[in-house]
């Protein structure tokens, strides 16, 4: 892989640290406080669609669901092999982080009943939104550096559209979607770390020979 395609050394750690801090902050503020739960529920109830509209929107959720995103991520990783096995592995690692993290956190993090009308399980982060983020992360690792800006903008918009769809259908709260974006940051950072791993040793070995 050309050196100019490698990220700045600090970028992966900035993404991982920022995403982790964002996740923690969202959980503490939106889930563990009365005002946070009230705000989250108010946004959800304001944007939630009526039954007729929800029935029309539901097929879109299936069309862009986690299974479809996993298949697309696998295709992106295979395409990444053309740029080296570390690039393909990095794309896969970033996607796996995005796909697995929401399932673990939803089980591990409790949601206290502070402002909810009835006891509810924790739904932060959204698995559907994180699945879209997984595809974006894989693409951000695989595509050339010159194309990453466009992928980042379009990918962020795609995550936002999926998030709005989930809120409109009443499946997730706003904080769940924001948390998925943070998971995406962590996944991207992880993918970049894996992609860049061993590059220093390769350069040193080439120089020595």
Region locations from a protein language model:
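Cytoplasmic juxtamembrane interface segments
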Residues: 1-12, 170, 198-203
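Hydrophobic alpha-helical bundle signature of multipass membrane enzymes
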Residues: 2-119, 140-141
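Membrane-embedded catalytic cores of phosphoryl/pyrophosphoryl-handling enzymes
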Residues: 116-209
